[in-house]
Design a protein with these regions (language model features):
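C-terminal substrate-binding/catalytic lobe of Rossmann-fold NAD(P)-dependent oxidoreductases
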Residues: 1-26, 108-230
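Rossmann-fold NAD(P)-binding glycine/threonine-rich loop
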Residues: 42-54, 61-84, 90-102
Length: 230
């Protein structure tokens, strides 16, 4: 891999990895084969507009999208290859796969809960990773996530009991990321968990995704496709 450009919407008088920050996004993107995006939803959509115009591949690690924004991303994927993941960690994506298998295997007597802890600076909740895991639970039941949690409960730190999937989000300190999925009945609890110790695992995953995306046709892909999970 070769880092060819960095973009920023503010002016900084310094270099990163020996490269000056470029304020002209479109001009900067012309130098790249793949664009890796870790920003905020509004910026992601702006990036996709330019990438679509330039026919550039995009890896999206941004989270916190609304359903409308998700729909716009799907439209852009008809023009360019896009890989989108709420978490770029290979381990977390394996956790999602195992979550789906567990959900499919267990009957409705088991209550599903997603518990996540992140640093105090993280704004969205439940986190993109927590929602990924929630989708894993829903997929295992052949259901839509939103039908199981209810739209009115999105963007809340705690989902009240009584829903099919319960989320509990905590923001404190400088914790990189802890996630746990629990399936509980009156007789037992099954727990699947993942803890991140180094943020480099996210950049490693994003670079792996970018390399994988190089030879792909237009479409919306996920880490599940990259890892070749069934």
């Amino acid at each position: 891999f070769k880092l060819v450009t960095l973009t920023e919407n503010k002016i900084y008088n310094k270099k990163i990895a020996g490269i000056n920050l470029d304020l002209n996004t479109e001009q900067a993107f012309k130098k790249a084969d793949v664009i890796i995006d870790f920003t905020v939803p509004k910026c992601t959509l702006d990036i996709l507009k330019i990438a679509s115009k330039l026919k550039k591949r995009v890896v999206i690690g941004t989270t916190g999208f609304t359903q409308k924004e998700e729909s716009l991303i799907r439209k852009f994927s008809k023009k360019i290859p896009i890989l989108k993941a709420g978490n770029m960690s290979l381990g977390v994506n394996l956790l999602m796969y195992l979550t789906e298998i567990a959900s499919k295997s267990l009957n409705d007597e088991y209550l599903s809960k997603v518990f996540e802890v992140h640093h105090k600076h993280k704004k969205d909740y439940p986190s993109g990773t927590a929602l990924m895991l929630g989708k894993g639970i829903a997929n295992g039941k052949n259901k839509n996530l939103y039908s199981l949690v209810g739209k009115k409960f999105l963007n809340k730190k705690f989902f009240p009991y009584g829903k099919k999937i319960n989320f509990n989000s905590i923001r404190k300190g400088e914790i990189i990321g802890e996630h746990e999925v629990a399936f509980s009945s009156g007789k037992e609890i099954i727990r699947l968990n993942h803890e991140a110790f180094d943020r480099a695992l996210y950049s490693d995953g994003a670079l792996t995704a970018g390399k994988w995306l190089i030879n792909k046709k237009s479409g919306l892909y996920s880490m599940r496709d990259l890892l070749n999970f069934e």
